[in-house]
């Protein structure tokens, strides 16, 4: 991957489902298994094809995130190429990306800040699809969004909160776009059409517009998906990560400098 990869992490929400923990800090800085959720999330990207040719875009909220997230990232990751964008109005996921458009060029990964998974991002080095959505089969998908895949293996559409159990490929909240510009064009179209749900612009609607326009979109299955969006889910994730940490140790590498630590 010759072009700079942009990793975009929207995190502007109020964190109401994590109160009282989010009264004094934004949700990504809440501790899970000895580290903040944000640190676990950034660890997840260690397998990107060219770590030293990667830039991060953090979309933060105006309350606590605007001050605390940049300070935390600058202190913890001094070698990271990072940009920070403030989303002052909660108008949805697509709106957040629209605000960050000046930084979004070429290949891009977007992952929500409460999504932890076991993805291998090294596959992006040779990826030919226009869009990849990471998915995980679950017994009951009705609380989530799912990807509908055609006989040819390409995604035909996304469905939010399906009414049946027939399609259980749940979209976990992480996507790759071969060209960020294509997504931004779809977001422009989404906003022009006024495609919203509860007055918010959802990313899956923008991707559906990309598919309408011919974008080849596929899924990539994962085996582990950990959520930190609610207190109960965070407690489960904390237990899972602690159990995993107790089974093995590994050498860590600073992916921004290549130095073992």
Feature names for model-found ranges:
Residues 38, 66, 70, 97, ...:
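A general structural signal for well-ordered alpha-helical segments in protein cores
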Residues 1-12, 17, 23, 30-31, ...:
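Conserved N-terminal catalytic core of the sugar/cofactor nucleotidyltransferase
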Residues 97-104, 146-149, 232-238:
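Short, surface-exposed amphipathic charged segments that create phosphate/polyanion-binding patches used
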Residues 1-4, 151-154, 181-182, 188-261:
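Left-handed beta-helix
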Residues 22-24, 166-171, 219-221:
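Short glycine-enriched loop/turn motifs at secondary-structure junctions
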Residues 13, 114, 137, 230:
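Active-site glycine-centered loops adjacent to acidic/histidine catalytic or metal-binding residues
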Residues 116-194:
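Conserved core of the sugar-phosphate nucleotidyltransferase
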Residues 29, 147-149, 219:
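A structural signal for short hydrophobic beta-strand segments in well-ordered beta-sheet cores
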